[in-house]
Structures are given as structure tokens and as C-alpha cells.
């Protein structure tokens, strides 16, 4: 997969993705995800019987981190912080839309 390929879709909230699926969606090696997981930089992921499972929110977070690291040469900790801030911004925008409803 090339960096400029665009994948569009919707993930059900009760669906879980594997490490390999998230790595493919982020165009990274699984080792990239493991390093970030070990450092606690990707929330909404859990290990069940030694197998990592990722929610849709974890996928979005990982994709944002990957983009920030690639596009801005950000260190992983900064990329994680920015991904957190972008998630907060998305949540606030959704609340404003609901208020304007």
C-alpha cells in the first residue's frame, strides 16, 4: 500500500481489529505498533490472552500518530499528545453540532 492510498469505511463500535489489520491500515510494520503500545501511546487497545485487540478509536489514534510522525517528523510522544488533542477537538465539535441541532 502506498502512502497516498486512501481507505474509507466505517468500523462498528463493537468490532475489534487485530495488530496486523491496524498495521496495514496505518501502512506500518506491526513492530511500530508494538513499540507504541509498550510505551502506552495508543489508548483503546487491549491485550487478551497475549493477543492485541484494537477499537475503532485506537485505529484512528494510530493513523493520526503515523501521519504526524511521517509528515512532521514528530517524536512518538508528541504525536500521541497531538492525536489526543485532535480527538478532544472532534468531540467538542460534535457537542457543538448537537447543541446547534
Where are the regions that the model predicts?
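Arg/Lys-rich, alpha-helical DNA-contact motif
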Residues: 2-20, 24, 30, 34, ...
Amino acid at each position: 500500500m502506498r502512502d497516498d492510498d486512501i481507505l474509507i469505511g466505517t468500523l462498528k463500535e463493537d468490532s475489534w481489529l487485530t495488530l496486523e489489520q491496524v498495521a496495514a491500515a496505518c501502512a506500518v510494520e506491526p513492530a511500530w505498533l508494538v513499540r507504541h503500545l509498550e510505551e502506552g501511546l495508543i489508548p483503546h487497545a487491549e491485550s487478551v490472552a497475549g493477543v492485541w485487540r484494537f477499537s475503532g478509536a485506537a485505529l484512528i489514534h494510530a493513523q493520526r500518530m503515523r501521519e504526524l510522525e511521517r509528515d512532521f517528523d514528530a517524536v512518538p510522544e508528541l504525536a500521541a499528545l497531538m492525536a489526543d488533542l485532535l480527538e478532544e477537538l472532534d468531540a467538542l465539535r460534535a457537542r457543538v453540532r448537537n447543541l446547534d441541532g
